[in-house]
């Protein structure tokens, strides 16, 4: 190629700005797509805003803009163009700051580019790269939407990455199995889309075709060089992968920029529309207008969830659990079992589901044997939780059509014995006719579950691999390593800690399966048959030949008129996870019970694809009349915004009532949401379970939910309660609700207004740990223990002390104030309810467990 470059200052200035603009937009799209992931989401957002602000600083002559805004304009079109441009730029920043939805965040970029372009045009400055960048960014976001909604495309890209990286590895004598995130294919795709758009917008395509193909080849050469480099690196943490992504970015950037600089990109040709002379007939005949409409409808269809109505809205959904030949138990937390084994496994799941109005059935071989092994032994200390109050237990040696006749969802968990052929036929006929199947498994063939599970799942081509799916980020576990595909099951998942996956198997699926949860920065750690004592687990390290990146942790698919969901890990559904994950589980059950089928989904997808193809045909063939290109990203974003406003109405929020306890996490409370640490609240959760309560972590202060609960717990909130929230709390207690507030003097500021309302105060007199014991702590273990206590002052005519001690004077550490049918319990220790003081997997304090039990009994008398 002939790379003669004019070296005059003007050209260098324009070329430098051209390169800078393209580079900053490429970086922005990669940031928002999580191709350069940052641990802190806020930091990612700030970085994106800084990149866009840099674009404004380098491109906008601020003085000239102010001058144009102040002066009277003879050319009103230029003035309106300037105003519209400024509005779009501001609107793009509003989008960036107001949502966490990746698609909306991405859609802000073409709006920003269009706004910047219009602003410059309003002051008679032309930047031809903005037309290219607007077209490119919109094309990329449309591609991203297709990957998210038509997951066969995701599978194709994932498999191409694995095959390509394996091929390069075999050529250099290295074994590599890399998903597109680790291999960098997602970054490569962004550059490919930019190059393709540049070619489409270039004039003299016959001349440009050679340059275009050379650029594509060099992008792939850059990718190959990158793969060779990383083949010699031992990956342990996510940062090991991330730190090298910038190398690939540069390798792809150089040939792309050279190609674009030498390409003759066409400038946008727009006929100014005079609003006063709008002709409806001309608009109808304008192909660009129809392209705009088709893009809007296609985007709306792709991003919206239709066909999600309950299949039996007037009847209870019936769920059958297969309770035999399985690894695991149906135990529930009970007194007498503490520490690591206290939680049990799956016994609380049907109890939670029953509280949400679902009817549960458990299928076992022998009812008597099952109850003798599962039902907790009655002790004087505990309120007896009868499992049969929440689930109907039926007896049968095999699964039959009659048993499944009235069932909506059939749940199979960790089976270690294959179903008989006639049972498998019954199950799949049940699904084919509209029933739903939920299959839960675990890692490395633990307990011999892999073959029976894979045997069951053959008709849908999903299988459990002999591995452990591990996150690459050891500090944050899976929280920074997930990717959720756009679908109704995960749509309401606001925080990744709701998923609660721990260590399970990765799934091998067909291209028809929907990858619900992807371990984007995950590792498929192959099992070791020699490690029988530790469930065949591998070495918890990356070894060459193991898949790195984009492993599937959970998948869904359609079969006939029915639906199937498969989880490679059971942790989400276990007792200890339910307070965090139940909202997510509720969405799973809702989707399985919905009317959406393969036919309705295929119809919705097919129509949207036809509309999108029609858009492309009109854009590239109808050139007589154009409309401003800025309208296309606006239409796209409008369609996305409408769908994201409508979708929550199509997916019901979690419904649960009864003995529900909400633990607030919406006021920056001082406890750790990560389970089983010193600062976690799992010990509190276990003791609530033992007393028949169903605790749930509440991430938003939702009055409609709280009013249906029995107890609302705030543990050292650091964000102040609002006046409306305090008024609601007062009404909640008047109607019988109980508030438990644990806060010491250092944290009381956020709760001060609530305390004052009930004549309560916490004095600045540090009492420290109580009782203070240096030797023989076992002598005091049946007494309550405080970590950092402070004295409470209260009106003895309104409240009463639940716990106090005397040291010259009386110090009250727990006070209850009655309000209507309920009341407020104040604990003057921010750490009293934490695991380190109540119960952890390694230790527990009997005195606090007994005191919590007495408090629960006291609350029961209030109800009576």
Where do the PLM segments sit?
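Coil-to-alpha-helix initiation sites in intrinsically disordered, low-complexity, charged segments
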Residues: 1-2, 163, 583, 597
């Amino acid at each position: 190629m002939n790379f003669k470059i004019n070296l005059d200052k003007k050209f260098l200035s324009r070329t430098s700005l051209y390169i800078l603009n393209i580079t900053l937009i490429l970086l922005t799209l990669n940031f928002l797509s999580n191709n350069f992931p940052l641990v802190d989401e806020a930091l990612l957002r700030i970085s994106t805003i800084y990149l866009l602000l840099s674009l404004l600083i380098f491109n906008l002559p601020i003085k000239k803009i102010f001058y144009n805004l102040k002066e009277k304009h003879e050319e009103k079109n230029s003035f309106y163009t300037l105003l519209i441009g400024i509005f779009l730029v501001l609107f793009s920043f509003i989008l960036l700051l107001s949502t966490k939805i990746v698609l909306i965040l991405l859609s802000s970029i073409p709006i920003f580019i269009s706004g910047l372009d219009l602003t410059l045009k309003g002051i008679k400055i032309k930047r031809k790269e903005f037309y290219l960048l607007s077209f490119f960014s919109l094309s990329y976001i449309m591609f991203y939407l297709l990957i998210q909604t038509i997951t066969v495309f995701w599978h194709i890209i994932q498999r191409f990455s694995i095959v390509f990286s394996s091929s390069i590895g075999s050529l250099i004598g290295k074994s590599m199995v890399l998903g597109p995130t680790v291999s960098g294919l997602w970054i490569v795709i962004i550059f490919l889309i930019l190059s393709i758009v540049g070619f489409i917008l270039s004039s003299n395509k016959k001349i440009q075709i050679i340059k275009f193909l050379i650029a594509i080849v060099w992008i792939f050469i850059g990718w190959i060089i990158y793969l060779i480099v990383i083949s010699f690196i031992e990956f342990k943490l996510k940062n090991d992968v991330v730190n090298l992504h910038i190398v690939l970015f540069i390798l792809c950037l150089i040939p792309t920029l050279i190609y674009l600089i030498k390409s003759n990109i066409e400038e946008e040709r727009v006929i100014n529309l005079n609003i006063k002379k709008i002709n409806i007939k001309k608009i109808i005949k304008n192909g660009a207008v129809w392209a705009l409409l088709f893009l809007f409808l296609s985007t709306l269809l792709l991003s919206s969830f239709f066909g999600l109505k309950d299949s039996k809205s007037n009847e209870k959904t019936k769920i059958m659990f297969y309770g035999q030949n399985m690894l695991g138990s149906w135990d529930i937390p009970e007194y007498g079992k503490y520490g690591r084994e206290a939680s049990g496994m799956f016994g609380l799941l049907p109890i939670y589901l029953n509280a949400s109005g679902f009817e549960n059935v458990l299928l076992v071989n022998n009812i008597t044997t099952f109850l003798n092994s599962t039902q907790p032994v009655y002790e004087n200390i505990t309120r007896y939780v009868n499992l049969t109050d929440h689930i109907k237990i039926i007896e049968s040696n095999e699964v039959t059509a009659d048993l499944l006749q009235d069932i909506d969802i059939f749940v199979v968990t960790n089976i270690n014995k294959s179903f008989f052929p006639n049972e498998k036929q019954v199950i799949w006929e049940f699904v084919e006719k509209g029933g739903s199947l939920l299959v839960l498994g675990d890692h490395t063939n633990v307990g011999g579950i892999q073959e029976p599970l894979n045997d069951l799942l053959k008709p849908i081509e999903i299988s459990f691999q002999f591995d452990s799916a591990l996150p690459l980020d050891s500090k944050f576990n899976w929280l920074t390593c997930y990717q959720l595909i756009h679908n109704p099951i995960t749509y309401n998942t606001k925080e990744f800690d709701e998923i609660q996956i721990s260590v399970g198997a990765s799934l091998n699926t067909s291209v028809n399966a929907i990858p619900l949860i992807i371990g984007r920065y995950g590792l498929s750690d192959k099992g070791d048959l020699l490690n029988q004592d530790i469930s065949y687990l591998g070495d918890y390290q990356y070894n060459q030949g193991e898949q790195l990146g984009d492993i599937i942790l959970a998948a869904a698919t359609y079969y006939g008129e029915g639906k199937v969901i498969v989880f490679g890990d059971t942790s989400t559904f276990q007792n200890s996870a339910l307070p965090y994950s139940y909202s997510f589980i509720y969405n799973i059950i809702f989707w399985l019970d919905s009317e959406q089928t393969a036919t309705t989904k295929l119809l919705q997808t097919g129509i949207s694809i036809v509309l999108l193809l029609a858009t492309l045909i009109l854009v590239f063939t109808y050139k007589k009349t154009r409309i401003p290109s800025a309208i296309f990203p606006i239409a796209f974003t409008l369609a996305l915004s409408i769908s994201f406003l409508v979708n929550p109405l199509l997916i019901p929020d979690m419904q649960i009532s009864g003995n529900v306890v909400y633990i607030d996490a919406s006021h920056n409370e001082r406890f750790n949401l990560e389970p089983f640490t010193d600062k976690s609240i799992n010990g509190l959760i276990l003791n609530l379970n033992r007393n028949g309560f169903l605790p749930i972590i509440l991430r938003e202060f939702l009055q409609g939910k709280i009013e249906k609960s029995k107890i609302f717990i705030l543990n050292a909130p650091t964000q102040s309660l609002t006046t409306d929230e305090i008024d609601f709390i007062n009404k909640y207690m008047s109607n019988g609700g109980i508030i438990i507030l644990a806060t010491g003097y250092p944290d009381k500021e956020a709760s001060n207004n609530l305390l004052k309302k009930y004549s309560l105060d916490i004095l600045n007199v540090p009492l420290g740990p109580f009782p203070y014991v240096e030797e023989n702590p076992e002598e005091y273990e049946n007494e309550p223990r405080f970590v950092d206590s402070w004295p409470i002052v209260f009106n003895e005519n309104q409240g009463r002390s639940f716990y106090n001690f005397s040291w010259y004077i009386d110090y009250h550490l727990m006070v209850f104030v009655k309000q209507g049918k309920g009341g407020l319990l104040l604990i003057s220790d921010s750490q009293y309810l934490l695991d380190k003081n109540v119960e952890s997997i390694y230790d527990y304090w009997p005195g606090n467990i007994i005191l919590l039990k007495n408090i629960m009994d006291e609350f029961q008398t209030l109800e009576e």
